């Protein structure tokens, strides 16, 4: 584990005024960063010659078993040679999109589903997958049981697809999981792709760009941020079973936190950056723009993930905005935590998890660009340390995307780039952690 000199700041919102605080010293006792040991025995090798794609969902159920949502479409042709007729190699085939592992790392069940992003499991064991909306699945059969309402069309004018198909084709691979993040020079010298932060004009010249802007303006006028349905796609899902609610990060308008009833999927409330009411969310592109090390955007920038703590606070991580916004569950703004503001490309503030102590004193933030898990003091937002670096060996990361914790304090991670795997890290002070430390000291 390494400690980093990272500039962090928070915006604290008392009742009557706002204040920017840069942390130098803090009164009271600051919690220490946790220490973990990589567990090489979890998971076990996948059965049936499966090859997992990029991990886009990770959740621990009530029995401490782990559900993994992966993207089979991420595999390239060389990874699915076993699917050719006749097979070209001993391995591999596309794995099912949903894989259920037990505590020992064995696959206990699986089912296929259309490609998605964001996943949750409720106390009854039902699965919720983010696709072009949120769909509820029976984990035993893989059957869709219900879906959160979505507007009847997409931003491009095409009808909304109520029954998306499984996207991969047997024996065929795609461009790979990193392709969308590679910045390709445009004719004007700008750089497109996700890595360019939208910095390149669409092809077809000014006329095509103007037409696209007009189409977008008409779409927003028809479906403004106050729309009580899903407008875009899904980034994150969390269930709050105790109060019969499900939280969804809709990626429209840079990101909206949307809350629905868990049993009937009826809309209840929502908010944007700084706790903006849905009616206050700006649709101006400049209000969603962010440059690394620059001023924070007025609205969410993009790729919003979400979680809530036991004491009723909600944490919305604006990944490409390099920050986390803390509100209560009604959307009242409390705190802005800035994280590794220098980070470009995919941003620094990914998944949000908490330490498993009673007070959940620590935040665990996954960072697919810097390939760290950041450990923050939840009360202040101060960075206490980090774990991981870019690499392909066990315990390293290449695109660490998703994270989850179990009741024992074990930390699970999922990678979306060439890592395309899940890993488990155990607390260093646990019996297993101490044993792993002893084994690491044994000379070959």
Language-model segments: what does each one mean?
Residues 65-67, 126-128, 245-248, 313-316, ...:
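Conserved beta-propeller blade signature
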Residues 24-40, 87-88, 207-209:
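Blade/loop signatures of beta-propeller domains
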Residues 28-29, 160-224, 444:
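Disordered, low-complexity segments in secreted/periplasmic proteins that are enriched in proline
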Residues 69-93, 214, 249, 258, ...:
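Short, conserved, GDST-rich strand-edge loop motifs in beta-rich repeat architectures
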Residues 40-82, 233-241, 245:
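Beta-strand-rich domains and repeat architectures in extracellular enzymes and scaffolds
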Residues 398-444:
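Blade-level signature of beta-propeller repeat domains, shared across WD40, Kelch, NHL, RCC1
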Residues 51-61, 94-96, 113-126, 154-172, ...:
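Beta-rich, blade/repeat-based domains predominating
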Residues 311-322, 327, 337, 343-385:
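Loop/turn-rich, solvent-exposed surfaces of beta-rich toroidal or solenoidal domains
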């Amino acid at each position: 584990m390494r400690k980093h000199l990272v500039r962090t700041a928070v915006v604290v919102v008392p009742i009557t005024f706002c204040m920017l605080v840069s942390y130098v010293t803090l009164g009271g006792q600051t919690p220490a960063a946790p220490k973990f040991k990589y567990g090489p025995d979890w998971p076990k090798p996948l059965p049936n010659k499966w090859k997992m794609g990029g991990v886009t969902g990770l959740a621990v159920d009530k029995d401490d078993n782990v559900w993994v949502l992966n993207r089979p479409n991420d595999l390239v042709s060389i990874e699915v040679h076993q699917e050719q007729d006749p097979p070209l190699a001993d391995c591999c085939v596309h794995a099912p999109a949903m894989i259920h592992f037990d505590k020992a790392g064995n696959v206990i069940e699986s089912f296929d589903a259309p490609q998605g992003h964001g996943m949750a499991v409720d106390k009854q064991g039902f699965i919720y997958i983010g696709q072009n909306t949120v769909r509820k699945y029976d984990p035993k059969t893989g059957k869709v049981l219900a879906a959160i309402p979505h507007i009847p069309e997409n931003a491009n004018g095409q009808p909304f697809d109520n029954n998306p198909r499984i996207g991969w084709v047997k024996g065929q691979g795609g461009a790979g999981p990193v392709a969308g993040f590679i910045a390709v020079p445009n004719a004007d010298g700008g750089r497109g792709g996700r890595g360019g932060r939208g910095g390149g004009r669409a092809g077809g010249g000014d006329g095509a760009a103007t037409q696209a802007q007009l189409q977008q303006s008409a779409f927003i006028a028809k479906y403004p941020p106050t729309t009580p349905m899903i407008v875009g796609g899904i980034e994150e899902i969390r269930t709050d079973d105790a109060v019969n609610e499900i939280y969804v990060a809709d990626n429209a308008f840079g990101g909206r936190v949307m809350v629905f009833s868990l049993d009937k999927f009826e809309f209840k409330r929502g908010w944007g950056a700084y706790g903006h009411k849905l009616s206050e969310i700006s649709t101006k592109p400049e209000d969603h723009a962010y440059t690394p090390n620059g001023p924070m955007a007025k609205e969410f920038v993009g790729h919003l993930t979400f979680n809530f703590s036991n004491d009723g606070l909600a944490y919305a991580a604006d990944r490409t905005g390099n920050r986390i916004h803390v509100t209560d569950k009604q959307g009242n703004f409390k705190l802005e935590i800035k994280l590794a503001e220098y980070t470009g490309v995919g941003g620094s503030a990914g998944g949000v998890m908490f330490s498993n102590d009673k007070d959940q004193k620590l935040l665990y933030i996954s960072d697919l660009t810097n390939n760290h898990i950041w450990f923050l003091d939840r009360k202040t937002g101060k960075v206490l340390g980090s774990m991981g670096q870019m690499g392909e060996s066990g315990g390293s990361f290449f695109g660490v995307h998703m994270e989850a914790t179990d009741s024992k304090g074990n930390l699970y991670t999922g990678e979306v780039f060439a890592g395309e795997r899940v890993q488990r890290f155990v607390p260093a002070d646990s019996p297993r952690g101490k044993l792993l430390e002893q084994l690491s000291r044994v000379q070959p």
